[in-house]
């Protein structure tokens, strides 16, 4: 049975220390979700980069790059917001924890973004299988075969 909460989030750049980490929020509440981290309402224009301070419980979490993708131009076929944070484990963890405390979003499980893309007609089953093979490729020949 599918989860009733349609808006999902997850780190899409991998885990661990990095200069930049990307957290993706995808679904009907994506814009409303990110707005909760802004001190003032901000109009997000599709595919325009915005530099914003992110706030939670009156504390500044980070200064981040925020990019909005309308559903017709996103990977998932859903309204999507990408948040490019500093890649500190503490910063990313605090942002993920804050997102997890909201009622209209849930943390994505493995393959949830691709499932959205498939359900919204953005990918065919053969593309989903090919992507899974590419992600799991351990050798160059497996990578080539997955393509």
Feature map (PLM): residue ranges:
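A glycine-rich (often HGG/GG-containing) alpha/beta subdomain
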Residues: 1-147
């Amino acid at each position: 049975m599918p989860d009733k909460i349609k808006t999902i989030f997850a780190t899409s750049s991998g885990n661990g220390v990095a200069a930049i980490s990307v957290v993706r929020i995808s679904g009907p509440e994506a814009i409303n979700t990110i707005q909760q981290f802004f001190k003032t309402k901000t109009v997000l224009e599709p595919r325009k980069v915005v530099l914003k301070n992110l706030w939670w419980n009156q504390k500044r979490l980070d200064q981040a790059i925020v990019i909005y993708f309308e559903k017709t131009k996103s990977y998932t076929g859903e309204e999507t917001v990408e948040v490019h944070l500093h890649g500190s484990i503490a910063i990313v963890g605090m942002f993920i924890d804050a997102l997890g405390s909201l009622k209209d979003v849930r943390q994505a499980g493995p393959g949830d973004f691709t499932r959205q893309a498939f359900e919204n007609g953005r990918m065919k089953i053969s593309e989903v299988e090919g992507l899974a093979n590419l992600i799991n490729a351990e050798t160059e020949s497996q990578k080539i075969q997955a393509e």
